[in-house]
Amino acid sequence: MAENSPLKAHNLRPAPGAKTAKTRVGRGEASKGKTAGRGTKGTKARYQVPERFEGGQMPLHMRLPKLKGFKNPFRTEYQVVNLDKLATLYPEGGEVTVADLVAKGAVRNNHLVKVLGQGEISVALQVSVDAVSGSAKEKITAAGGTVTELV
């Protein structure tokens, strides 16, 4: 780049000597030939040391603890609907079914639904869903409603 030319992106070049060719080792007896910088003999010269080998130190995969427990294949997962959500969806009370909740967008179709007791309810609801928690059942019956569990 000439001394007087302005500094622009299309004029930029790497500094001289900044970009050097990759050294190809083990090609003939010149520099980095023959033993290719590995020294003579020994395990490290023979490409038999795995990358994970830590030189006799306890390996990382053995230093970490094993995972405990297991994943239960028979676990049932429910979609959760709380009482405060039911109070906003049904302000006048009435019948609450899984199909109604799907239609109102509270839950997805073809999944089990469980009503939990977070929040308060003051209207009578006739709830028929897959499962209901104990606290939710108490609050619904105290408000004058009924509970039917499908499962």
From Swiss-Prot:
<protein>
    <recommendedName>
        <fullName>Large ribosomal subunit protein uL15</fullName>
    </recommendedName>
</protein>
<comment type="similarity">
    <text>Belongs to the universal ribosomal protein uL15 family.</text>
</comment>
<keyword id="KW-0699">rRNA-binding</keyword>
<dbReference type="Pfam" id="PF00828">
    <property type="entry name" value="Ribosomal_L27A"/>
</dbReference>
<dbReference type="GO" id="GO:0006412">
    <property type="term" value="P:translation"/>
</dbReference>
<keyword id="KW-0689">Ribosomal protein</keyword>
<dbReference type="GO" id="GO:0022625">
    <property type="term" value="C:cytosolic large ribosomal subunit"/>
</dbReference>
<dbReference type="InterPro" id="IPR001196">
    <property type="entry name" value="Ribosomal_uL15_CS"/>
</dbReference>
<dbReference type="InterPro" id="IPR021131">
    <property type="entry name" value="Ribosomal_uL15/eL18"/>
</dbReference>
<dbReference type="InterPro" id="IPR030878">
    <property type="entry name" value="Ribosomal_uL15"/>
</dbReference>
<comment type="subunit">
    <text>Part of the 50S ribosomal subunit.</text>
</comment>
<dbReference type="GO" id="GO:0019843">
    <property type="term" value="F:rRNA binding"/>
</dbReference>
<keyword id="KW-0694">RNA-binding</keyword>
<dbReference type="InterPro" id="IPR036227">
    <property type="entry name" value="Ribosomal_uL15/eL18_sf"/>
</dbReference>
<comment type="function">
    <text>Binds to the 23S rRNA.</text>
</comment>
<feature type="region of interest" description="Disordered">
    <location>
        <begin position="1"/>
        <end position="60"/>
    </location>
</feature>
<keyword id="KW-0687">Ribonucleoprotein</keyword>
<dbReference type="GO" id="GO:0003735">
    <property type="term" value="F:structural constituent of ribosome"/>
</dbReference>
<dbReference type="InterPro" id="IPR005749">
    <property type="entry name" value="Ribosomal_uL15_bac-type"/>
</dbReference>
